[in-house]
């Protein structure tokens, strides 16, 4: 349908994307035209929810949030009128739609995105013994803000599920540039971490194949990737604006050990997604996406496999997530609006921060009857 259509325009370096398109469809169609937009990893995620709430991805430090690449959008507002929102038409809706979250101001039917030429792509994976996890996390958080914007990385701490409380620590990422420059950018991390990785890979990859690797459907076609099924999981998130060290790092490592003892039969962990680069070059009030000073966004999650877990396990999982949120509390500066969290206290402030009053003002102007309403929609007054 036209709602899933992706139409690249190499002359204007733009792409018109229907609101129903999935990320893997966008990546596939644009790659065929040697173009990209920065967006998320999960192949079956819809472009609209992702873009309206920000959109972090593996090329975000190089090209910005997905929302930063919206040149204009078409939206049906609560009065039933289809409107074009851009820097010079309905500028308030355009501002609110770049980070203000989905389902708040109207029904988006299409986006026009700014696109970028596909660069050389390199992938990297580094793994260390669990005993090095604290040193690796601390080194990673201090290293990342000083890396080139072409580099994106995450740091993953995963429970191995054993009552002994061990786990897996790895740093993975994508570099939009030559292999030699990627290796050079990684050198300070390897030096700072202090110990040699147990596994190390750095190498070039085709752009579209790299997107399938990051999306968990390596080497598959668009239609195959679009059929990927996901395990059931529950998660929370915290933005971190300053590198953790000492007690903060120890507390996070302890959280992984705690998961294995609290609910030993489930998988889970904490992943720190890197921010910075051009994401943080944008002022916090330039768009509705306020999180412009973060070193990383931490997502802590537990995977169930499929279906709902027994109550006994669910209780343990909830307890661990809440305990981990408490561990992050001294360092947290909000939560990611696209990782919507039904149990988050003060969610509106956590998602939107200092932009909340303006978002509420725009909500009152365009949807005074609160027609577009859900449990965590933008409130009419803030």
For each feature predicted by the language model, list its residue ranges.
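Soluble FAD-dependent oxygen oxidases
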Residues: 1-382
């Amino acid at each position: 349908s036209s709602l899933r259509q992706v139409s690249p325009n190499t002359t204007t370096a733009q792409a018109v994307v229907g609101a129903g398109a999935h990320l893997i469809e966008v990546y596939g169609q644009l790659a065929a035209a040697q173009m990209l937009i920065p967006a998320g990893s999960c192949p079956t995620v819809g472009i609209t929810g992702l873009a309206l709430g920000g959109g972090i991805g593996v090329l975000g430090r190089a090209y910005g949030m997905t929302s930063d690449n919206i040149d204009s959008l078409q939206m049906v507002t609560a009065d039933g009128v289809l409107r074009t929102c851009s820097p010079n038409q309905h500028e308030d809706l355009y501002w609110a739609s770049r980070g203000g979250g989905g389902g708040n101001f109207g029904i988006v039917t299409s986006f026009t995105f700014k696109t970028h030429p596909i660069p050389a792509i390199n992938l990297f994976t580094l793994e260390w013994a669990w005993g090095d996890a604290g040193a690796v996390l601390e080194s990673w958080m201090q290293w990342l803000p000083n890396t080139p914007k072409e580099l994106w990385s995450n740091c993953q701490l995963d429970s191995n599920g054993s009552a002994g409380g061990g786990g897996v620590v790895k740093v993975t990422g994508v570099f939009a540039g030559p292999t030699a420059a990627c290796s050079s950018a990684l050198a300070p991390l390897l030096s700072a971490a202090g110990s040699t990785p147990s596994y190390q890979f750095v190498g070039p990859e085709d752009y579209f194949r790299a997107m399938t690797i990051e999306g968990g459907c390596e080497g598959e076609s668009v239609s195959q990737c679009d059929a990927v099924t996901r395990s059931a999981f529950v998660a929370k998130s915290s933005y971190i604006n300053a590198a953790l060290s000492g007690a903060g790092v120890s507390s996070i490592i302890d959280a992984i050990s705690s998961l294995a003892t609290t609910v030993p039969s489930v998988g889970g962990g904490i992943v720190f997604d890197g921010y910075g680069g051009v994401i943080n070059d944008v002022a916090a009030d330039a768009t509705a996406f306020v999180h412009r000073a973060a070193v990383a966004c931490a997502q802590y999650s537990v995977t169930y496999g499929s279906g709902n877990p027994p109550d006994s396990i669910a209780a343990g999982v909830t307890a661990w997530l809440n305990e981990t949120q408490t561990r992050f509390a001294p360092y947290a500066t909000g939560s990611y609006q696209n990782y919507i969290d039904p149990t988050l206290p003060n969610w509106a402030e956590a998602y939107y921060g200092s932009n909340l009053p303006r978002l509420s003002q725009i909500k009152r102007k365009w949807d005074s009857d609160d027609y577009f309403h859900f449990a965590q929609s933008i409130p009419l007054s803030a």
